[in-house]
Amino acid sequence: MSSQLIPATRRVLNNAPLLDAAHGKTPTRTPVWFMRQAGRSLPEYLKVREGISMLDSCFMPELLAEITMQPVRRHDVDAAILFSDIVVPLRAAGVGVEIVPGRGPVMDQPVRTRADIDNLPILDHEVTEVSKGISIILDELTDTQALIGFAGAPFTLASYLVEGGPSKNHERTKAMIHAEPETWHALMERLVPTVVNFLKTQIDAGIDAMQLFDSWAGFLTERDYTEHVLPYSTRILQEVEQYQLPRIHFGVGTGELLGAMSRAGSEVMGVDWRVPLDKAAERIAAVSGPKVLQGNLDPALLFAGTEPLTREINRIKGEAAAAIAAGNATGHIFNLGHGVLPNTVAENITEAVSIIHAS
């Protein structure tokens, strides 16, 4: 991996609303991007993905670049989010994993013993297919549009590995945490360099910001999160701090964990739709001081029609403004409180972006 702190390929963006907001400056308009904005809600996505598996498409530079750019062209969002998947770094390291349609990532072999952990491959090289894809994306983005890279946090990766795939209850994961804490911590230690090196691939290729996704952290108590998860997410964010790009931290169902998660060290905290933004800001500021907020429209509102959608967007923007006025937040990036739902009508997303920018 490159040891260069600020890559030569990094763009200098002086008028990108998302980066201005992430740095606590006043943007020219409310920046917005949506988690899963590149995906099944877009007919053009379904067309280019036809006959190609999800994971394979993440390792095809021209295709991943095209998919990344589709929602930017269509919706006028203020950022592209790299088309990838949480398990891509595992696949790149040599872990046997496939994304099964209708189910999600499924491991060839679950990781449940210390021997399994010791044999778990570690990503120690650049993922060149991703680097090449980022280069193509950067050639098309304007200087007002940021490129966000991302990686899954080690807890979420560990859960997929231990459970062998998606889980409704994460019972094997929680059992390992409590019954075999040394084994659990060994697994988390093993995953940290894989996550860091996947982020460094993206940083060296020139991304403008990054998000650490902890999709399943909301299944944990605050005590378990603080003791068994937080130290590893903190280390990952510390490892990339030197590159001087905004770091976003997000998990689903993490309203009760926002204070704890904020201690990991990101500049921006993602909030899901279950917690009002001004209340979320209070929880974050009480622990870590004011941060930039990201969120938090319920994805289901994209099915509700113009009037309810406009009302909810204005409510959320009002909560963000109140949090900033109270000194509990330093900025706001508009997003959903989770990913775009697969059956969302693409035109509804475009309308939401227009309302966010106009109001």
Curated annotation (Swiss-Prot):
The record marks D85 as: Transition state stabilizer. GO terms for biological process: protoporphyrinogen IX biosynthetic process. GO terms for molecular function: uroporphyrinogen decarboxylase activity. Keywords: Cytoplasm, Decarboxylase, Lyase, Porphyrin biosynthesis. It is found in: Cytoplasm. Its EC number is 4.1.1.37. GO terms for cellular component: cytosol. It comes from the Bacteria. InterPro entries: UROD/MetE-like_sf (IPR038071), Uroporphyrinogen_deCO2ase_HemE (IPR006361), Uroporphyrinogen_deCOase (IPR000257). Substrate binds at R36, Q37, A38, G39, R40, D85, Y160, S215, H338. Pathway: Porphyrin-containing compound metabolism; protoporphyrin-IX biosynthesis; coproporphyrinogen-III from 5-aminolevulinate: step 4/4. The keyword Cytoplasm applies. It catalyses: uroporphyrinogen III + 4 H(+) = coproporphyrinogen III + 4 CO2. It is an enzyme of class 4 (lyase). Catalyzes the decarboxylation of four acetate groups of uroporphyrinogen-III to yield coproporphyrinogen-III. Homodimer. Belongs to the uroporphyrinogen decarboxylase family. This is Uroporphyrinogen decarboxylase. It comes from Corynebacterium efficiens (strain DSM 44549 / YS-314 / AJ 12310 / JCM 11189 / NBRC 100395).
